[in-house]
Curated annotation (Swiss-Prot):
GO terms for biological process: translation. Belongs to the bacterial ribosomal protein bL35 family. GO terms for cellular component: cytosolic large ribosomal subunit. One of its GO terms (molecular function) is structural constituent of ribosome. Pfam families: Ribosomal_L35p (PF01632). The gene is rpmI. This is Large ribosomal subunit protein bL35. Residues 1-50 are annotated as: Disordered. Keywords: Ribonucleoprotein, Ribosomal protein. Residues 1-46 have a biased composition (Basic residues). NCBIfam families: rpmI_bact.
Length: 66
């Protein structure tokens, strides 16, 4: 059976943490910042963690990623 390939689009969007979790960027950060408060923009800059319900599915796509 051939090796599982890493889903390249997902590999560019997620980073693994030391404890085995995954970091991701926030949505809504591309444009139209005039409609968002300063506080909202500040919080959107920080990375977020992938939720536990999505973790198993995403890790399967990133099977070869270290």
């Amino acid at each position: 059976m051939p090796k599982m390939k890493t889903h390249r689009a997902s590999a560019k969007r997620f980073k693994r943490t030391g404890n085995g979790g995954l970091k991701r960027h926030h949505a809504f950060t591309g444009h139209r910042f005039h409609g968002k408060t300063k506080k909202q923009r500040r919080h959107l800059r920080k990375a977020a963690m992938v939720s536990r319900s999505d973790l198993k599915r995403i890790k399967q796509m990133l099977s070869q990623m270290r």
